[in-house]
Design a protein with these regions (language model features):
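Sec-dependent bacterial lipoprotein signal peptides
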Residues: 1-23
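A Zn2+-metalloprotease active-site environment signal
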Residues: 22-247
Length: 247
């Protein structure tokens, strides 16, 4: 029997509401590492159809070099990380489940050519989201993904997969996830030989830019909420050198 899109949407809505009630938990990931990798690859394919990827420029090489320097200092080695630059003026960086990490051109322009420390902290933060499985935990609460991956529900079309890419780009993390990724990213940067104070400089630049633009919230801040307590916590972690290797 052919099911209509409205039937598919209703099924997804019901499952998304019922799943947390059945499990009693919104923070557990129901995706295996293999499923995370598969989901990330599909999301990356969709994103790279929408945005032009910078492959061979000095900026692209810089991003790959910093990413490769961070990787030996993390504990989750079972995913194939990649580091790419997307040609968009948005000030943002995103990481997908399973390892794809994207730095947006607008972010590189804001940081300039010399502050590798700040860029390393930002990329470490994004790696922290992957390592902490933050996106996978959120996506697990949306049974649309599980239906696509596990059951092949009729109606899961390329349009659904394109929407999945948009979900990755606009995924808003919880306060706890942001603090966890800050801790992880600062630790990765520190042990890779970068100055973790680069993260504070980045936060301060974002705040100044936001004030100059009349309070208009930049893309990174929309998906990575920033507040005074978060900045203070990062400053305290750096001051106390409370870095944890591989976490």
């Amino acid at each position: 029997m052919k099911r209509s899109p409205s039937y598919f949407c209703l099924l997804v809505l019901l499952c998304a509401c019922v799943l947390p009630l059945l499990t009693g938990c919104r923070t557990r990931s129901f995706l295996s590492t293999r499923q995370e990798i598969s989901l990330g690859r599909e999301g990356a394919r969709q994103i790279e159809q929408e945005y032009r990827v910078d492959i061979g420029s000095p900026d692209a090489q810089r991003v790959r070099r910093i990413g490769e320097r961070l990787l030996p200092h993390i504990d989750k080695r079972d995913v194939p990380y990649s580091f790419k630059v997307l040609e968009t003026k948005e000030i943002n960086a995103v990481a997908l489940p399973g390892g794809p990490v994207y730095v947006f051109r607008g972010l590189l322009d804001m940081l300039g050519d010399e502050d590798d420390d700040a860029l390393a902290c930002i990329m470490g933060h994004e790696i922290g989201h992957v390592n902490g499985r933050h996106a996978a935990k959120q996506i697990s609460s949306n049974l649309l993904t599980n239906l696509i991956i596990n059951f092949g529900v009729p109606g899961a079309t390329n349009q659904n997969l394109a929407a999945l890419a948009a979900t990755f780009l606009n995924l808003k993390y919880t306060r706890e996830d942001e603090l966890d990724s800050d801790r992880r990213g600062l630790s990765y940067a520190h042990f890779a030989g970068y100055d973790p104070k680069g993260m504070i400089r980045f936060f301060e630049k974002l705040e100044r830019l936001e004030r100059r633009m009349g309070g208009e919230r930049q893309e990174w801040l929309r998906t990575h909420p920033l507040n005074t307590s978060r900045i203070q916590r990062a400053e305290t972690l750096i001051e106390n050198k409370n870095f944890q290797y591989g976490q």
